[in-house]
């Protein structure tokens, strides 16, 4: 028999236990939301494949992947390795030339893995500041983050002209003959092959596919815009799908969940270019939280936290969250 002396503390502690458990749940929820919103940058540049990467850089691929995954920019690995080719070509121990990003003199870092760790942290920081715009990220990696502010004040989108103007302006301010490399983006992109802006016919694709993709590709590289559904506001995932399909005379509902309900479910083997692909768990919300346009060969075109771009469905984040494929009824 339990005495009153013992029972009373147990009874009165129950509310405190409940409150304690509730606090833990709230903290875990907030932590998850922060992870999705801040630490993970989904999607990325699965359309980019490396070209001409030197063996001195390629041998560190596993290291690049390790820290890119750790920083939430795994889908940018090929871009980061292309950047490294431009920075050092693998001919320096400070392989990503990242010493200056932590306030050290050039080439202070003498361990390639440390250089990659620091360089990818810096890349991730700049990538977020650039809103997922890969070209703006690359140029800012060379110029410094001040270039991002300059672009935001001058149209909000990277152009080669802005890079040239910024270089001249900074050189004048500093009293130097030149400032940075205004052609840095071109120099990095030599080492990757990416998507073709011209939509090519895909065997077995839906009749409307070319019209849809011709419209969608107009916005490639633009940042993700929560709640956006037109060119003026920018696009979120379902907004891009709805807008692009409307250009082919196809009316779709607004949200990813609703678009999922408006399509006929098909298997991955049945899926062809022009079908939709749906995902769950990309943030705390409904069962279906993301949608993309399937383009064939295990890839989709979509608007995600990394911007409007192609993404790989074969492995990684999107594979883990894939729910189903759908065909327009």
Curated annotation (Swiss-Prot):
Gene3D superfamilies: 1.10.530.10, endopeptidase domain like (from Nostoc punctiforme). Keywords: Cell wall biogenesis/degradation, Conjugation, Hydrolase, Protease, Secreted, Signal, Thiol protease. It comes from the Bacteria. Changing residue 100 to Q: Retains 10% of muramidase activity. Its main location: secreted. GO terms for molecular function: cysteine-type peptidase activity; endopeptidase activity; lysozyme activity. CDD domains: CwlT-like (cd16891). Residues 59-192 are annotated as: Muramidase. Residues 206-329 form the NlpC/P60 domain. It is found in: Secreted. Disruption phenotype: Deletion mutant shows no detectable conjugative transfer of ICEBs1. Changing residue 23 to A: No detectable change in conjugation efficiency. One of its GO terms (cellular component) is extracellular region. It is an enzyme of class 3 (hydrolase). Optimum pH is 6.5. The keyword Chloroplast does not apply. Belongs to the peptidase C40 family. Exhibits both muramidase and DL-endopeptidase activities. The N-terminal region acts as a N-acetylmuramidase, which cleaves the bond between N-acetylmuramic acid and N-acetyl-D-glucosamine (MurNAc-GlcNAc) in peptidoglycan. The C-terminal region acts as a DL-endopeptidase that cleaves the bond between D-gamma-glutamate and meso-diaminopimelic acid. Cannot degrade purified B.anthracis peptidoglycan, which differ from those of B.subtilis. CwlT is required for ICEBs1 conjugation: the muramidase activity is essential, whereas the peptidase activity is partially dispensable for transfer of ICEBs1. The cwlT gene is located in the region of the mobile genetic element ICEBs1, an integrative and conjugative element (ICE) found in B.subtilis. This is Bifunctional muramidase/DL-endopeptidase CwlT. It comes from Bacillus subtilis (strain 168).
């Amino acid at each position: 028999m339990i005495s009153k002396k013992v029972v009373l503390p147990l009874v009165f502690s129950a509310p405190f236990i409940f409150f304690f458990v509730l606090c833990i749940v709230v903290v875990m929820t907030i932590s998850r939301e922060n992870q999705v919103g801040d630490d993970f940058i989904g999607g990325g540049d699965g359309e980019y494949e490396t070209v001409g990467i030197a063996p001195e850089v390629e041998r560190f691929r596993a290291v690049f992947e390790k820290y890119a995954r750790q920083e939430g920019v795994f889908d940018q690995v090929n871009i980061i390795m292309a950047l490294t080719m431009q920075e050092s070509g693998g001919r320096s121990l400070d392989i990503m030339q990242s010493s200056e990003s932590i306030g050290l003199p050039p080439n202070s870092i003498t361990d390639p893995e440390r250089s990659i760790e620091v360089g990818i942290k810096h890349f991730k920081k700049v990538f977020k500041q650039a809103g997922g715009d890969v070209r703006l990220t690359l140029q800012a990696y060379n110029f410094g983050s001040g270039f991002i502010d300059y672009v935001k004040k001058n149209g909000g989108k990277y152009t080669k002209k802005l890079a040239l103007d910024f270089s001249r302006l900074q050189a004048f301010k500093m009293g130097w003959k030149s400032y940075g490399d205004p052609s840095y983006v071109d120099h990095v992109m030599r080492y990757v092959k990416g998507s073709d802006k011209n939509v090519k016919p895909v065997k077995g694709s839906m009749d409307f596919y070319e019209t849809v993709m011709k419209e969608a590709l107009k916005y490639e590289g633009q940042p993700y815009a929560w709640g956006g559904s037109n060119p003026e506001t920018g696009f979120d995932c379902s907004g891009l799908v709805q807008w692009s399909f409307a250009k082919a005379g196809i009316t779709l509902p607004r949200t990813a969940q609703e678009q999922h309900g408006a399509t006929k479910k098909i298997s991955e083997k049945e899926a062809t270019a022009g079908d939709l692909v749906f995902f769950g768990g990309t943030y705390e919300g409904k069962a279906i939280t993301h949608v993309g346009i399937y383009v064939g060969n295990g890839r989709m075109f979509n608007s995600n936290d990394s911007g409007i771009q192609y993404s790989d469905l074969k492995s990684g984040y999107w594979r883990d969250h894939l729910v189903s494929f759908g065909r327009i009824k």
